[in-house]
A protein has these predicted regions:
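Histidine-dependent nucleotide/RNA phosphoesterase domain, centered on the 2H-phosphoesterase fold
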Residues: 2-211
């Protein structure tokens, strides 16, 4: 991994029991051709649009950056066991919270099994990063609202049905108030690791903003 201190200096192990932090995550990022329609909605409705790229979280929070040297070989091993699959992104749903609702695009419209299998395969190696025992629901957040039915219907009409190949997972982290930045991309089926010191897709915005 080319001498990068984030990743070098430790060999693989079966599991890594490190306490999670909200400053890191393992996620799937949709291909860039899907970003404009998603980001147009997020800029209107998502207060986290400057902090997060469009994403489906698989492990959040994840281990702190100082553990990446040990975490990356485990992610690579899990990714190597997980074949790529085609996801259908269709339908907009919402989670209700006390003060608002989170509206989200469903990336598992073709069935949750491949997502669940991928999340389980990765999560087995990080037992403290698997949440609190709740059911894993893959989702791509679009925004917050007091009127989720109206916004969900509007977003569904704007987005329609999209498909994308889930062929890699991305390791993200942030420093201070900076956005979440991809640090590595890990290919499903092979476990190949590509280090990414910076990754800013072209398009709307710059200077620390996601497109």
């Amino acid at each position: 991994m080319n001498g990068d201190p984030l990743f070098d200096g430790a060999g693989p192990a079966d599991v890594l029991e490190a306490a999670p932090t909200a400053r890191t995550a393992v996620a799937w990022l949709p291909p860039q051709e899907l970003w404009p329609a998603i980001q147009d909605i997020r800029w209107e409705h998502d207060p986290q649009v400057r902090r997060w790229p469009p994403h489906v979280n698989l492990l959040f929070g994840f281990v702190p950056e100082e553990e990446f040297a040990r975490a990356v070989p485990l992610l690579s091993a899990g990714a190597a066991e997980s074949p790529a699959f085609t996801a259908r992104l269709s339908g907009v749903r919402y989670f209700r919270h006390r003060q608002y609702a989170t509206v989200w695009l469903d990336p598992a419209a073709a069935g949750p099994e491949p997502w669940t299998r991928l999340q389980r395969t990765l999560g087995l190696r990080f037992p403290l990063c698997r949440g609190h025992g709740g059911r894993f629901t893959p989702h791509l957040s679009l925004g917050r609202t007091q009127d989720p039915r109206r916004l969900a219907a509007e977003c569904a009409a704007r987005l329609g049905t999209r498909t994308a190949v889930v062929e890699e997972v991305v390791l993200l982290s942030r420093h201070g108030e900076e956005p979440m930045r991809p640090r590595a991309r890990i290919t499903l089926g092979t476990g190949e690791v590509r280090r990414l010191p910076e990754y800013w897709p072209r398009g709307r915005g710059s200077g620390g903003r996601w497109m």
